[in-house]
Swiss-Prot record:
Region (Domain III, AAA+ region): 257-473
Region (Domain II): 71-256
Similarity comment: family membership: Belongs to the DnaA family.
Domain of life: Bacteria
Pfam families (alphabetical): Bac_DnaA, Bac_DnaA_C, DnaA_N
Record's subcellular location: Cytoplasm
Domain I, interacts with DnaA modulators as annotated region, ranges: 1-71
Record has Ligase as a keyword: no
Name of the molecule in the record: Chromosomal replication initiator protein DnaA
Natural source organism: Teredinibacter turnerae (strain ATCC 39867 / T7901)
Positions annotated to bind ATP: G301, G303, K304, T305
One Gene Ontology MF term: lipid binding
Length: 593
């Protein structure tokens, strides 16, 4: 018989489970009785009945209790024609009582394969015109106080453990319920389990894994020859890593991994990062809004991770129960590989798609990893349509990431993309003063300016240099001065002096503009040579301690007024010409890193 409640449940499970699991365990179930109080399902044999009770019962009960038909009790029985015990009839064909529609044809737009179970959330759905992406399934932000977040009945901390767990839980869509009797005999099933999982010639339910992606081959490993119910339980227990302490709502456990020392209050703002700070502050105030996703890019050690953690900490402080997860992109890949190995990809999807905010650092690590990009693409779509905030960081503009799919690059630009530039002199001094104050070590202005003038590349190296100075002052019991800074950083300063000599500046500039070093010394005045020469003079004045006449002599014996004109010209062009500004920034990074 057909039942709308069961049809809805089947549709949800088909979206959540891998096709192999769905076709093997869910499709054979049929409805024998359905009323306002009871839903009675019939399994073709005892083997399927026990497996569904052990692995899927809690999830089925959750879906039917939230369905339009209202709460029902669930009963799963065995067909009368099946013998008692565990019998597997080879080549048996059990026609499903509930028709399962084939996947809809492509509409030309990439969609997430994950659909939240109907009734699990009271969120309203609306389009999202801010991102230029209209969807009838888009929910409001999960941080809205008027909205209830749905919880999943699966306990898990992370996908980190590949060892079988001895603990048994009564909850879980894949690994819940108490274990079957331990005294059941081991039953030879050689070839039988293979029949359960192996597609027939006429079946199109399974797709051959792409040979270009070795990760997919994990799913096609051989089936064990002899199994028992105890074996199956032990295997199922490996799918997820259990936690001893249950969540208050019995849902998935999310560890945020945030560094609580990275907050907005201790972020030093300057011209180079003020746009990034403003965007991050707006996201913290209105997560899931117009700035979703927020994509922050820039060089190493410039504060991208600090801003990301600051947003996460602000969200948790604002709503302590918020499911905020921070991780490096490498961790996402490792979790996915572990889920494939344990055949727990559905758990992986449920974990990452049930967060309120997902913060992923160094997204460029996905480059060249096709399977990881595929999974992240669907996770990205599911979170975005659910109104859940996404924050990503990268070391370069998304369009410049080689090995990243175009559909991901385009989606990264749906929200707001901001750049973090290397800090200017005043910001570097402010950072040094703030760090010295937190270390309770007075830092004179002249010493701070000396360090800031010599360390330009990034904040991380700046802080490292300050730590060396403070340690030297404490060990020698001296106050910090320019002389002490010279002593503490003498090896670093000597190396830097070698790297930023006029000769090295000329070589780097010539390579950057694809001209010869001799062209910089020549009398040629064509634009293709004159502009690089002016840039090289500007960098020599900015990075070295040579006088204007000395710099002029190094560029073919030019007058000091020519050098002064070049410095002023490049300084002015940086305000009006984005190309010159980008060239100077790239050359500074090359010369000072």
């Amino acid at each position: 018989m057909s039942d709308p409640c069961w049809e809805q449940c089947v549709s949800c499970l088909q979206n959540e489970l891998p096709s192999q699991q769905f076709n093997t365990w869910i499709r054979p179930l049929r409805v024998e009785e359905s009323s306002t109080l009871l839903l009675r399902l019939i399994a073709p044999n005892r083997f399927v009945q026990d497996w569904v009770n052990d692995k899927y019962r809690t999830r089925i009960e959750e879906i039917i209790s939230n369905s339009d038909a209202g709460p029902k009790s669930l009963e799963i029985a065995v067909a009368q024609r099946a013998r008692a015990g565990f019998e597997v009839v080879r080549n048996a064909k059990v026609a499903p009582a509930v028709p399962v529609p084939d996947p809809l044809p492509s509409t030309g737009r990439d969609e997430s394969s994950f659909q939240p179970p109907k009734g699990n959330t009271s969120a309203d759905y609306s389009g999202h015109s801010d991102l230029g992406f209209q969807s009838p399934h888009r929910r409001q932000s999960p941080f809205s106080e008027s909205q209830e977040r749905f919880t999943q009945p699966l306990e898990m901390s992370r996908f980190g453990s590949g060892r079988p767990s001895n603990e048994r839980s009564n909850e879980g869509a894949i690994g819940g319920s108490t274990e079957s009797s331990a005294d059941r005999e081991r039953i030879p099933l050689q070839g039988v389990v293979e029949d359960l999982f192996k597609p027939t010639k006429n079946s199109n339910d399974f797709v051959e894994p792409r040979s270009t992606d070795p990760l997919l081959e994990i799913e096609s490993r051989p089936i064990i020859e002899t199994v028992s119910p105890r074996d199956i339980q032990d295997f199922g227990s490996q799918l997820t890593s259990r936690v001893k302490k249950k969540d208050v709502e019995g849902g998935i456990q999310h560890k945020h991994n945030l560094n609580t020392t990275f907050i907005f209050d201790n972020f030093v703002v300057g011209k180079s990062n003020q746009l990034g700070l403003a965007a991050a502050s707006q996201v913290a105030e209105n997560p899931g809004g117009a700035y979703n996703p927020l994509f922050i890019y820039g060089g190493v050690g410039l504060g991208k991770t600090h801003l990301m953690h600051a947003v996460g900490n602000a969200l948790v402080q604002r709503k302590p129960g918020a499911r905020v997860v921070y991780l490096h992109s490498e961790r996402f890949v490792a979790d996915m590989v572990k889920a494939l190995q344990l055949n727990a990809i559905s758990d992986f999807k449920r974990f990452y798609r049930s967060v309120d905010a997902l913060l992923i650092d160094d997204i460029q690590f996905f480059a060249g990893k096709e399977r990881s990009q595929e999974e992240f693409f669907h996770t990205f779509n599911a979170l975005l349509e659910g109104g859940q905030q996404i924050i990503l960081t990268c070391d370069k503009y998304p369009k410049e990431i080689n090995g990243l799919e175009e559909r991901l690059k385009s989606r990264f630009g749906w929200g707001l993309t901001v750049a973090i530039e290397p800090p200017e002199l005043e910001t570097r001094v402010a950072i040094l003063k703030r760090k010295a104050e937190s270390s309770r070590m007075p830092l004179p202005d002249d010493a701070a300016f000396f360090i800031a003038q010599r360390i330009r590349s990034n904040v991380r190296e700046l802080e490292g240099a300050l730590k060396r100075v403070i340690a030297n002052a404490q060990f020698t019991q001296r106050s910090i001065s320019v002389e002490l800074v010279r002593e503490a950083l003498k090896d670093l300063l000597a190396l830097q002096d070698r790297l930023v000599s006029i000769d090295n500046i000329q070589r780097v500039v010539a390579e950057y503009y694809k001209i010869k070093v001799s062209d910089l010394h020549s009398k040629r005045r064509s634009r293709s040579v004159a502009r690089p020469r002016q840039v090289a003079m500007y960098l020599a004045k900015d990075l070295t301690h040579h006088s204007l006449p000395e710099i002029g002599d190094a560029f073919g014996g030019r007058d000091h007024t020519t050098v002064l004109h070049a410095c002023r010209k490049i300084r002015d062009l940086q305000e009006s010409d984005a190309d010159i500004r980008e060239d100077v920034k790239n050359l500074l990074r090359t010369l000072t890193t």
